[in-house]
Amino acid sequence: MNPNKRKGDKAEREAAEVLTKVTGFECKRNLAAGIPDDVGDIYGIPNCGVQVCDYKDKNRACLVKPREVETQRKNAGVDFVASMVRFRGGEWRVVLTPEQFNTLLQAALQ
């Protein structure tokens, strides 16, 4: 296994643990991630897809992954998506486009 794949798998496992702890939903890695019709890296949160990223270039991760996860949202047929970006020291941030944030906000205000 190449080092980038190993790093990505580790980040996905860690993200699933973080999301399980924070949300109370049992979140797991989607082992079919990265294939055509990709539906995201993590499943277990109802009506939501999650993309995980541990790029060295965090700026790139924050710009690219939220756009990519939009395609995964359509593939999965879910209403909500988020990108989780790992920072040094195991710190995580959830990144959304303004449109993704608005979708979440409008649902919360219902």
Q: PLM features: residue spans?
A:
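Catalytic phosphate/metal-binding cores of nucleic-acid and nucleotide-processing enzymes, i.e., regions
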Residues: 1-110
